Amino acid sequence: MSNREAPFLHFYGKHGIIPTHLEVPDIAKFYLIRDRLFETIGVASSLIKGCDILEVGPGSGEKTAHILSKSPKSYTAVEGNPASAMAIKNLLLTFESSVKIFLHEVDFFDFESEAKFDFVIAENVVPFQIEPSEFLLKLINFVRPGGLLIFNCVDGVSMLSESLRRILCRKLNLIDSNLTASAERIADFFSADLDQLPGMSRKKTDWAVDQMIHPFGGKLISISESLKSLMSFARYLGSSPSFYTDWRWYKDTSFLNQDQNQPVIDSFTSLQHNLIDNRETSVARSIIENNTLNEISSKVFELSKVNTWDHALEQQLDVYCKAILQNLSKEQILTRQALNGFCTFLETSDGKDLTAFRNWWGRSMQYVSVVRI
């Protein structure tokens, strides 16, 4: 067994929880949303039929059920959280007559197999690993040439609104040793915020545990960082949100170049500021400006890991927030209003000052698909 720290597995296993459970009142609608997601990242979900699938971290299994409904040839799951493994077992029983199913109850870093797969799917597990790039490289190793890897990215910019909410939890002492009571306090405090979150599909208390209380000992990883890590192993196919437009003719000889990911990286970085707020979208801007924005926002994320909040940390946060305000494009009016309100609240502790902030959510987690080369 690996001696490395496993951020998700340690926290979930310690408390015996699965805070990723999705509330799915309408299965048909949920499956349609999943189909549209796959199409957005360049994959018709019908292509799963007859394929060999590896899923890492299936969690409570709602998304797994969608995959299995597409009739793959085989499905292999790697799940290291005992509570999740128990939940996924019950789901897999309903499909074992039509699909070859294999469940490995281990940490992914301890998983070994000579098999290669048509699809490797790792949703919500790459960001916050101790070394996300290393995790990606192990994932791509299980993809056969021409096969697809589907994963997520979260960077400092997309995470900023939630990093600030994590900081509020610590400043206001909403977290203590009682996990359930802490989650209820946080869910109550941010209830109005969550009511503004499009597509919210899990319990507010589960969100509180997974996003606010979870210590997040690992690192963020952006789309650009992930594509750089995979440069020699995989080629970008698609993403959600979609940001890359390629006007080349299909016979253009540049398609034969080895650095196919570089134009995508440049495009992403020039538009990265749009991840900060799901209510606003503006034109491309300087890569230098966005690198600075991501650097400062990532520092805010690091502050959100601190357990005990004090005046010195608040002063540092104020410096970061003012730098972000200065960095924002003039079109980012709603983001500016929200961040100004947050900064005012730090000074006044008057809940009314958070009014504009409560509507602010970033494009937190992005989906990415790449082709193994």
Kindly label every feature range from the protein language model.
Residues 28-49:
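Conserved alpha-helix/loop element of class I SAM-dependent methyltransferases that forms part
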Residues 134-145:
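A short glycine-rich, Lys/Arg-flanked "PGG" loop and its adjoining helix->strand segment in the class I
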Residues 150-186:
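Conserved class I S-adenosyl-L-methionine
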